[in-house]
Amino acid sequence: MTVRKPEWLKVRILSEDLNRMEAFLKNMALNTVCQSANCPNMGECFARRTATFMIMGNICTRNCRFCAVEKGHPQPLDEEEPRRVAEAARRLGLRHVVVTSVTRDDLPDGGASHFAKTIYELKKLPGVTVEVLVPDFMGNEEAIRTVVEAKPDVINHNVETVPRLYSRVRPKADYIRSLNLLKKVKELDPLILTKSGIMVGLGETEEEVIEVMKDLRDIDCDMMTIGQYLRPSHKHIEVAEYVTPEQFKRYEEIGYKLGFKHVASGPLVRSSYHADVGLSLARG
């Protein structure tokens, strides 16, 4: 049975801003996760002249059942892409830049060196802070080290859901491997802020969400995002429930009590939604 979408999840799309930003990105030959994942905040973010750049193409090597990004055989890396991302950030006047990627299990380092090159290019821009949302690199510690040594301000890696639902929601991923990545970042450089996020509405319980929060705090994760899972198409896993704004507020309060420096919890919250604000609050 299909669960009806509530009023609090209906958003107005600002088509003029959307069209303008999409034309700019097309001209720069760049992808955003905003477009590839059909993000509900795309109109608002594009109106604010912010976007999350998605590097290493727009085809993923995994088949997570919640994700709208295309699956298949990716193209070779574009060596000029890191420079173009930095140029786009400069032209848009961005002060905080978020970079993510598809998962590239076909590459020896999972694309870590490409992330590092992009971070180095962005760090050339005066006063710019950089946040990266990385895949799990199949647990490759050298790959994680490569990204850490490029010194982004924030390294985000989403655990996405509670452990019980992994086999159904993201069968090629591993909950412990994801926790270990975030733990390794802190071991290598305690000054880098770490961040993770989950979707709710997939059939998890409140107790399971709280356990994930505790697991993240146990590895000194600084920031957390919690948002509603929205089904991209009939091919994707169904929504089990639409979590109320009141429950999201409760998760936020619990997160702060557990010691997170910043918690963004709401129906439309996504990993990089108002990430600049999150960084500022986390730094105090």
From Swiss-Prot:
It is an enzyme of class 2 (transferase). InterPro entries: Aldolase_TIM, Elp3/MiaA/NifB-like_rSAM, Lipoyl_synth, rSAM. Binds 2 [4Fe-4S] clusters per subunit. One cluster is coordinated with 3 cysteines and an exchangeable S-adenosyl-L-methionine. Its cofactor is [4Fe-4S] cluster. [4Fe-4S] cluster 2 binds at residues 60, 64, 67. Its EC number is 2.8.1.8. It is found in: Cytoplasm. GO terms for cellular component: cytoplasm. GO terms for molecular function: 4 iron, 4 sulfur cluster binding; lipoate synthase activity; metal ion binding. This is Lipoyl synthase. It comes from Caldanaerobacter subterraneus subsp. tengcongensis (strain DSM 15242 / JCM 11007 / NBRC 100824 / MB4).
